[in-house]
Each structure stands twice: as structure tokens, then as C-alpha cells.
Amino acid sequence: MNSRALRFAGPAILAAVALVALVGSLAFGGGAAPLLVGDPGPVVRWMLPVAQLAVNLSAAVMVGALVLALFGLRAGERPFEAAVDAASVGAAIFTVAAAATAYLTFLNVFNATPSAGEVFGRQLGDFLVGTELGLAWLLTTLFGAVLTVLTFAFRGWTATLLIAALAVVALIPMATQGHSGDEADHNIAVTALALHIGGAAVWVGGLLTLTVVRGHLDRERMLALLRRYSSVALAVFVVVAGSGIARATVGVVSWEYLVSPYGAILLTKVAALLLVGVLGAVYRLRLIEGIRTAATAHRFWWFIAVEFAVLGLASGAAVALSRTPPPVDTTLPLPAVRTPSEFLTGAPLPPEFTLQRWLTMWDIDLLWLFVVGFGLFFYLVGVWRLHRRGDRWPIYRTVLWVAGLALLAWVTCGPMNAYQDYLFSIHMLGHMLLTMAIPMFLVVGAPVTLAARAIHRRTDGTRGGREWILWAVHTPFAKLVSHPLVAAAVFIGSLWLFYYSDLFRWSLYDHLGHEWMVAHFLISGYLFVQSLIGIDPVPLRYPYPFRLLTLLGVMAMHAFFGLAIMMSNALFVAEWFGSMGRTWGPTPLEDQYVGGGIAWSVGEIPTLILAIVVAIQWSQSDERAQRRADRHADRTDEQELKEYNARLAALAERDARAGR
């Protein structure tokens, strides 16, 4: 299969197999069956999933092409331009498909008859801006339109990176669709679906982009690109598989689900993904090197065509699965009246928080579980690389990095994540650990220094992990936020702004707000600690006395913040914490008082440790400076001291002559 044929055959195979799989799965599972009440008609029932499939595939092209361009190609050259061109086309199709999905979803939900009348237009407008479902698709369409313009207009390194970040954000509203919003474990379902969509987009879109740029690269450069894509694909396969398992665990209530049409489609999708994983392992381990010769290269690209077919099967089954109603478990009791906790959080009230539950209660946050897992894996791989080539890496840095990640996992996936929606004090304890304790461990682990030493340097003008990390560290924005004064201001200002504004309310009501809160406070704490005791390079490092003064100021503001909460008689987000219906533990106001005490006392402990570390580093810095001065004096036979004494003697002699 030549380059031109594969450029068109790859997307055609993917789209055709996906469409056939979609139609077959819908017919088998009843996802497009007529509704007993309010049926919108066969056109809407069949065209809506087709439009959703177009959204998914075009999103994959848009995201995957940008990611592959950033990590595998060189800006300014024709292959890079071709990849971004593919992203532009994908964004344009994504916009049209999202708009069509929004329109068809409106017809499906409201059973409206299309017309050019004012009433129909007003109903459509109310749906798009007045309902969560309509707003999600409206935002998706607007994101697509903006991305279409940006991908056509900008092609540099930085611009493409920002556009790629926006493209990933554009996928978030899609994660609220399907069955995710209806399930009891809503947060897990939404997070799993978001990770699943994002990972699949990078995987499928990257593979499509390989066929697009193949004709613009010689065999050696194509071989290098395939290796880089293979590494990225391996990482996203882990994400797609892990999130898919979590998503299926939420959706499949019992094993009987698997013998239903819903279960059959689910198993088909799982089998297709596993097969793609096997195919990926085969070409990673055995076939990539074969593109050096024409005969084996021909076999390799036919192998890729087969992978497109299997990915099409998985893509079609995935869309059909989101439209197929799961079986009803008749053995479950009828739902009782919803409790206040279920009304607010979507989950029943957990059991009383006891000492035992500090170690036994878990509530997994899939996003941070992946962050911890990848952070641990890549760090240990970096240490192993240094050890293998004979370089030394202090063991204490590795131990502290692992301890920091373990503490992060415990905070985001353990008892604090399970009880923070119900107890303000637990929420505050988790916040203090995120901003103060965890960053201390991670900063001393020096991940940037390790990455700079362990990741292979690119010599062909492309950018890999090492190049992007070093670029990020030296950007003007990084210089601004890592400035000690700015880092301290963001660190302490965020504390007050978050709790005394609607941001706190947003983090409770919206899972996206919760994830933003965790990321923001972890990063702000990391930047603050890095500016004080960091080992990694920073644009500006203030003198030690100034660092201690900064810490004293932060300690004072922390104390004021904690005291303000303890002295307050007004309950934070009273309609949440005051309406939870807890029958155990302290009252909401008493619990808030405890939370204020935690902010004052527990928050000061890491600050005190930081002050001790800064003082120790100051002392060690003075000792190193003295040793350098002593070595310099030994090398020069104390020539500077002799010259200084000679000048003093000359001045004394001159003064003596003047006195006579």
C-alpha cells in the first residue's frame, strides 16, 4: 500500500468499520428502537448516534494530530504543517458534527417538529442555554469553531501547544454525556469517561496522522516518528484500559449484565481494545524496524490498516453502548426516598468517621491515581537510567518523592476524599496537606533535575519530554509564577479567595471544580516551596534572610486565616454542610471550628519545618562559601590577603609620614 493510498484508505477503513459496527450494535442492542412515548422518529434515532460517532472520530483527528506534531515533528517543516492541517480539518468536522449532535439531541429530548417558526427557535435556544445537556453541546460546538480558526491561523511551537491544550479542554463537556450523568458513582464515571475519550483521541488520531505525514518523511525520520508514537500510544493505552475498566465497573452492576445485549456490546468493545493493544505490542517489538526495507515496510503498513479496522470496531461499539439502555436488575429493591446526602452528592451518607477508617476507607479519584502512578513510574525509570550509566542520584530524593506521591494518593483516593464532602474539618486537613506537606516531599525529589539528566536529548530539532520540560521552566510565565513574592502571594491569596468566594461552592457542587481545586492548591504549594528550598533550577533565587521573612509573613497569614474561621458564626456553604443530614459527629458549626483550628495549627507545622530547612540550607551555604574561599586562598598562597595587608601597611606608612 503506497503513501497516497494509505493516506485515504486509513481514515476510510476506520470510518467505514466504525459505521458498520455502530449500526449493527444499535440494531442488536436496541439503542435506536422506537420509544413508547415521545418517539422522535427513525431519522433522529439513527442520525443522532451517527453524528456522535463523527464527533468522536473528528475529535481524535484534532487532538491526536496536534499531540503527534508537538512530540514527534519539527515546527516549520512540511510534516509538521501537514499534521496541523489534519488537525484543522478535524476541528472543522468536529464543529459541524457537534452542532448537528446538539440539534438532533434537542429533537430527541423534546420530540419537537423542525420548523423555521419563532416558537421552535425559542425552544431550541432555551435548550442550548437553559439545560445542562444543551449547554454541554453548545460549548463543544463553540470550542470546535474556535479551534478551527486557531489551527488555520497559528503554526508555531508555543501556539500549537496552547491550541492542543484547548483541544483537550474541548473534550471535557463530552464526558458528561452518555450514561455518566445518571449513575450513582457520578464522579468516577465522569472522570473515567473524560480520560477514556482523551486517551482514545490521542491514540486513534495519532495513528491517523502517521498516515498523513508518511509521504513527507524519509524512512529514517519515519522510523523515529513511529518509535515516538509507540511510546505515547503505550502510555495512553494504559489510560484507556484503566479508565475503561473503571467505567465498566460503574456501569455493570452485576454479572448478569454481561449476558444482555448491553453486555455483549461492552464485551465486543473490550475485546477490540485488547486486540489493538496486542497489535500495538507486536509492531512495537517486532515490526517497526522493518520499515527500513520496502518489502517489510509494505507489510507493516498493511498491519496498520488492520489496526484501523479494529479501532473502528471499538469506536462504533463505544457510541452504540452510550445509546443502549442497560438491563434493569429486578432483584434490586425499589428506590426509597432520596436522603439529603444523596440529593446533594449523589451518594448515600458514609458511616461514622472513626479511627479505623483512616486506613480502611477509600474513595478512588481516577485522575489522581493515574497522576501518582505515572509520576512514580517515570521517576523510577529516570533513576534507573542514571544508575545504569553509572551516575549517582541521592537515595533520599527518591524516598521523599515516593513518600510524597503516597501521601498524595492517600489524600485524593483515601478517607479524606471519602469524607471531605461531609466534614469541613476533613476537607481542611486535606487542603493543608495538599498545599504544605505534599509539596515539601515532591520539591526535594527534584523531578526537573532528574528529567534533565535522565531523558534523552533530541538532536533532530524536534521536542521530547526533556525539551518541553526545560522550555516550560524558562518561559516568562514560569519566571513570573516562580518569583518568591508572586509564589507567596498566590499561595496565601488563594487560601482567602477560595473559601470566601463561590469557588468553594463550585468545588462542592461540580466535580470539575473539585479537580481544579486539588490541582491548583497542589501546584501553588509546590511553587511556593520550590521558591524556598527547591533543588531544581529557578529563574530567581532570593537570599536566605528574605526567604525567612517571607515564611514569617505566610505563617502570620495562615494564623489569621485559621482564627477567622474559628471565630466565625456563619457556616461556609450552609446549604451544603448544614443540610447533609448527618446523625454522627460534631454539628456543622462545631466541625467548622475544628477545621479552623486545623488551618491554624496543622498548617503551621509544615511552615515551621520549612523555616528549619531554610535555616539549615543557609548555614550550609555559608560553610560552602567559606570552603571555596579557603580553597582559593590555598591555590593562590593567600595572595589576596597578602595584597590586602600590603595596602594597609602602605596606608599606615603614608599616615606616619604625614604626621611627621
What do these predicted regions represent?
Residues 1-660:
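Alpha-helical membrane segments of multi-pass proteins
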